[in-house]
C-alpha cells in the first residue's frame, strides 16, 4: 500500500515542501512558501511540471501549511487532507540527544527547543514548521530528521576538541557535523551502484555546495567529518571561512575595532570564495572570471579545491584506504573543473579518473567518472535529502 509523505524544511520565514509517494520514492509535487510573516508572501507549487505562483499575506507557518493543504486539494493532488500519511521535518541540530531520527512527541519538541542554543538560527525555525503540521494534521506521525544524527557514530578521538575536557561535559562543546542526511543518502546510493554491501565499503563523501562538508564513512557509519561545533568549520565555502587559526579572532578584533559578533559575521558571511575573490560566492561566476584572466578568482578556486583535496587524503589515512569517493550537492554534481582539481594527483592512492566521463556528468546526471581499472571508484550522485527524509518517516513513523 503506497503512502504519501511530506518532506519539510522550515526556515524562519520560509517553508519548502515535497510530497513523495512511498516506498516508490515518486515525487508527487513540490513547492515553497516565502516571506512568511511579511507583506506579499509568495506561495509556489508545481502542478504537472508547471510552477503556479500566488502572492498574498501569510501571517505565520500555520497559515502557510493551511494554504499548502488547500492548494493540494484545489489542484487535485489529494482528495482530502487525510490522504497524507506522515510528515518528516529537517531539524538542523539534534546534539548528542538524537543519534537517529525520531517520532515527534511533546517531549521531543521540548528537547529540540532546548538544543536551540546550539543552532539558534535554525532549530527555532524548524520547530515552527513542526508545530504548524502537528496542529493541522494531529492524527498522523510526524518525524524529526536531524542533520547531525548521522555523525553521532564518530568516535571520541574524532569529535573531541583539545580543550579543557569539562567544556565538553558542561557545555556540550564538541564536533557535531552537518549535512548528515545527504551524506547518508549518497553513501547508501554508492553501495547500491557498486552492488556491494555498504558494510564492506570505505567511502569519502564530498557534499560541495554553497555550504560544504566532507565525511569519512566506514562500513556505512560516519567516523569523521569536516564541519564542527557549527557549520563554519572545515573546508572553504561560498561565504564561510572554514578552519582558521582561532587566535585570528582577537587579532582581527584588535586591528579593526570590531566586536567578536561582528568578526563571526564576517567569517560566516563575507569570507570563503566571496572573501578571497572579492567579487562573488558563486562558483560559476568565479569560473568565468578566472577564464577571462582574473587572478584572484582563480586563486579562490585553487584554495577551495585544495582544502577538499587535503581532507580526502586525511580521511583515506583515517580509514586505512578508500574504496569510493562521492561528489554531491550543487558544485559536486555540476562543476567539472572543481572535481578535476580535487582529484588531481590522487593516483598514488589508486584514484584513476577519466576526464571525458567527468565532463559528461552534470545537471542531475549520476555515474562513475573513474577508469574501469581504477582501484578507487569515483562517483557523482545527485543528493536527495527529501527521499532520505521520507524513508525515515516510513521507518520511525511506523508506516512500513
Curated annotation (Swiss-Prot):
Give the binding site residues for Mg(2+). Answer: 9, 385
Give the record's keywords alphabetically.
ATP-binding, Cytoplasm, Kinase, Magnesium, Metal-binding, Nucleotide-binding, Transferase
What EC number(s) would the UniProt record show? Answer: 2.7.2.1
What family does this chain come from, according to its entry? Belongs to the acetokinase family.
Looking up PROSITE patterns in the UniProt record yields:
ACETATE_KINASE_1, ACETATE_KINASE_2
Q: Which residues form the active site?
A: 147 (proton donor/acceptor)
What does the UniProt function comment say about this protein? Catalyzes the formation of acetyl phosphate from acetate and ATP. Can also catalyze the reverse reaction.
- The name on file for this protein is Acetate kinase
Organism this protein belongs to? Staphylococcus aureus (strain NCTC 8325 / PS 47)
Q: Which residues bind substrate?
A: 90
User: GO molecular function terms here?
Assistant: acetate kinase activity; ATP binding; magnesium ion binding
Q: What is the annotated localization of this protein?
A: Cytoplasm
Gene name per UniProt: ackA
